[in-house]
């Protein structure tokens, strides 16, 4: 009887550890993916870079994308 209880507790502990590990290892967002709602989820070599959208001088929104760290993007005419 003690062996059955011990086995049950060990299995419960193993399942709990597996679930906790899976929750901590969320998939990161790859390059050029939208990160407006999740700025901390970009992969390690990327940063969530945000840009304001303007129309006639008034701000109408914000876009955020996972981009390479240290890279500067410029608008082309």
Curated annotation (Swiss-Prot):
State the family it belongs to: Belongs to the neurotoxin 19 (CSTX) family. 08 (U8-Lctx) subfamily.
Q: Which residues form the propeptide?
A: 21-26
As annotated in Swiss-Prot or TrEMBL, what is the tissue specificity of this protein? Expressed by the venom gland.
Where is this chain's protein located in or outside the cell? Secreted
* InterPro entries, per the entry: Spider_toxin_CSTX_knottin (IPR019553)
The molecular function terms in GO held by this entry are: toxin activity
The UniProt keywords, alphabetically, are: Disulfide bond, Secreted, Signal, Toxin
Please give the name of this protein.
U8-lycotoxin-Ls1b
Q: List the signal peptide residues.
A: 1-20
Work out whether the entry's keyword set contains 4Fe-4S: no
Q: Name one GO cellular component term.
A: extracellular region
Transmembrane residues, as ranges? none
Describe its PTM? Contains 4 disulfide bonds.
């Amino acid at each position: 009887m003690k062996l059955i209880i011990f086995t049950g507790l060990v299995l419960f502990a193993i399942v709990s550890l597996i679930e906790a590990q899976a929750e901590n290892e969320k998939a990161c967002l790859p390059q050029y993916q939208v990160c407006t709602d999740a700025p901390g989820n970009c992969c390690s070599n990327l940063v969530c870079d945000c840009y304001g959208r303007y129309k006639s001088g008034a701000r109408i929104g914000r876009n955020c994308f996972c981009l390479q760290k240290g890279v500067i993007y410029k608008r082309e005419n």
